[in-house]
Amino acid sequence: EDFSDYGVIAGGPMMGPLLEDLNGFITKKDKGFIILPKNHPLIKKKSCTFDQARRVNRSACEQCRMCTDLCPRYLLGHNMQPHKMMRTLSYAPHDVEAQKIASLCCQCNLCEYFSCPANLHPRTTNAIFKQNLAEAKVRYQPTETEFHARESRKYRLVPSKRLVARLGLHDFDRPAPWTEETLHPNEVRISTRQHVGAPAVPVVSAGDHVE
């Protein structure tokens, strides 16, 4: 089929990456795929590059703190404060020490897809800083070992229905019943590397009969 007018997300709408190459194959790590028109807001958001996000973030962030106030990591008691990372991007982009707390980001994308009223890219900023820290071989060292959820957490949880609506997926949120259809492919190829670590070692050879 022709997917030139569509974008394909591997996994969920929040953390799933946008596939750049559709000539790959399904592995045991794949949970599902979301196919949306290329002009869909979510596809456009996921298509944003580091350079594009950097320029927009520097010019439009109003330091409203909404990204931090709704951040799941922050609400659990961690020192993850996306609005400070946005500030660092604008005023101290080369200060590696100030970028350390970006390591606490779990890349859930709530700040980027829901919280920010200006439609900016706080999560991408954290990804940029994580890349900088990796290149500089700098690791975040926590100053605390015990964390306690902030008292405001129970009032700041995001309703899933509201999130689906904000993502523009309400029209696509419909039952997907299991199908009993049996597929009979002519050829099956199994990658020996579908996980972290060394590739798997085949126990059969080319031409062997496998039931």
Predicted regions and their residues:
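Catalytic cores of enzyme domains
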Residues: 2-45
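N-terminal, Lys/Arg-enriched amphipathic/low-complexity engagement segments
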Residues: 145-205
